[in-house]
Amino acid sequence: MKMIKTICGAVILSVGFIACSKSGTPGDPADTGPYQLSYGDSILYLRPSSGDYIVSPLKHREGVYSGFPEGIEIDGVTGAINVSNSETGLRYRITHISPKGDTTKTTVVLSGITFTDHFYILSAGDSVANPVYNAHPNRVLPLAGSVFDEGNLANGGGCSVKTDNGKINLAESIRRGVFGHTPDNDDKKEIEIKYRINDGSGKSLNKLKVLLYWYNTMADVPQYVWDILSDRSSQGVFLRGSSVEEAAQASRIEQAAKPRPPCVIIVDH
C-alpha cells in the first residue's frame, strides 16, 4: 500500500512538473497566435525615477520594433520605450514585424504638452498660443497644482509664458523683445519650457522646445517654412485621434517625420 502511494505521488508530481514547464515555452499556442501589441495603456506618463523611465510591451515577440514619427526612443529588439528620452506630448505608432514578416501596430501617447504648427496674425487678434495636452486639442489640461516655465528659462528669454496654464502670449513676447528691439523678417528664437503637470506623471519634470518665427506679412514667409509645414501634414498629423493610422494607410512611402519643435509663426499683419 505504501509503495502504491509512493508511485501515485510520483505520477502526480511528474504531471505537475510537466504542466508548469509547458507554460511560457516557445511552443505554447499563446506565443504563436496573433500578436496583441500593447503597453498596458494608450497614454504613457513620465514617472518619478532615479534613472530613465522605461515601459516595455506587456508581451514580447521576436522581431523588430519601430516607432513613428521621429522623437520616440524605442529598443528595436525588445520594444521597450524610453519615455524619459522621448519627445512627449505626441502620439506615436509602434510597429512590430515578426521574423515571418507579419506586421502588428498600436498607438501610444507620451503624455505632455505641445503646440500646433500655426500662423498667428497679430493684427487679427490671434496672439495667444494654447498648449495641446496629450496629443488631442479637446483634452482638458489639469491646471490645479501644475506649473509651467519652471526655472524661468522662457520668460527670462523674453517669451511670455503663463506659469499657471502654459499659454504663450505672443504679442507680449514681441513687446518684451523676444526677437530683439525690432524684429526682422525670418527672425527665429527657440525657447524651452520646463513644466510639471498634476496628472498621472506625479508632477514629473517634463520639457518642450518651441520654435518662434517672425514675419511682417504672409507674403514674407519663405518657401522653406511652407515646405516644413507641408511635410508634416503629408507625413501624418501627430495630434488628433487616429490620424497617424489613417496616414499610414495611404499608398505612399513614409519618410522620417520630424514633428518637433512645433513652429509658432508670428505674422504682424
Which residue stretches match the model-derived regions?
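Intrinsically disordered, glycine/charged-rich N-terminal periplasmic/extracytoplasmic linker segments
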Residues: 74-129
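Alpha-helical transmembrane segments
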Residues: 11-14
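Low-complexity "stalk/linker" and mucin-like segments enriched in Ser/Thr/Pro/Ala/Gly
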Residues: 64-82, 146-180
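Disulfide-rich extracellular repeat modules and their boundaries
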Residues: 24, 69, 85-87
